[in-house]
């Protein structure tokens, strides 16, 4: 049973050294408030990867979930594109 709309993000896996956890870098393009120049801003999210299937460079979709640990509030929903080996 789904409760409301959950936030989702698409990003690239930058680290998978932790057990059942990956770090996903999500980039977004925003206009600078003063000058209007388009700049790229990035955020990193720790996400739960139950199957430990993600590799560095994979493009994944993460969705919001209940807090799993101090830093983890996201989980990997699907792998959109696998990294080239």
UniProtKB/Swiss-Prot annotation:
One cellular component (GO) term of this entry: cytosolic small ribosomal subunit
One of the GO BP terms on file: translation
One Pfam family recorded for the sequence: Ribosomal_S17
Gene3D superfamilies from the UniProt entry: Nucleic acid-binding proteins (2.40.50.140)
UniProt-listed InterPro entries: NA-bd_OB-fold, Ribosomal_uS17, Ribosomal_uS17_bact/chlr, Ribosomal_uS17_CS
PROSITE patterns tied to this protein: RIBOSOMAL_S17
Record flagged with keyword Cytoplasm: no
Highest taxon in the source lineage: Bacteria
GO molecular-function terms, A-Z: rRNA binding; structural constituent of ribosome
Keyword rRNA-binding: yes
Keywords from the named record: Ribonucleoprotein, Ribosomal protein, RNA-binding, rRNA-binding
Family of the protein in this entry: Belongs to the universal ribosomal protein uS17 family.
Subunit structure comment from the entry: Part of the 30S ribosomal subunit.
Role this protein plays: One of the primary rRNA binding proteins, it binds specifically to the 5'-end of 16S ribosomal RNA.
Name listed for the protein in its UniProt record: Small ribosomal subunit protein uS17
Source organism of the structure: Anaeromyxobacter dehalogenans (strain 2CP-C)
Underlying gene: rpsQ
């Amino acid at each position: 049973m789904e409760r409301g709309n959950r936030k989702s993000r698409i990003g690239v896996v930058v680290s998978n050294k932790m057990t059942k956890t990956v770090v996903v870098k999500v980039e977004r393009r925003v206009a600078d408030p003063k000058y209007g120049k388009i700049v790229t801003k990035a955020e990193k999210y720790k996400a739960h990867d139950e199957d430990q299937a993600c590799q560095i460079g994979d493009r994944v979709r993460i969705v919001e979930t209940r807090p799993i640990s101090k830093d983890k509030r996201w989980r990997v929903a699907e792998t959109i594109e696998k990294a080239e080996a």
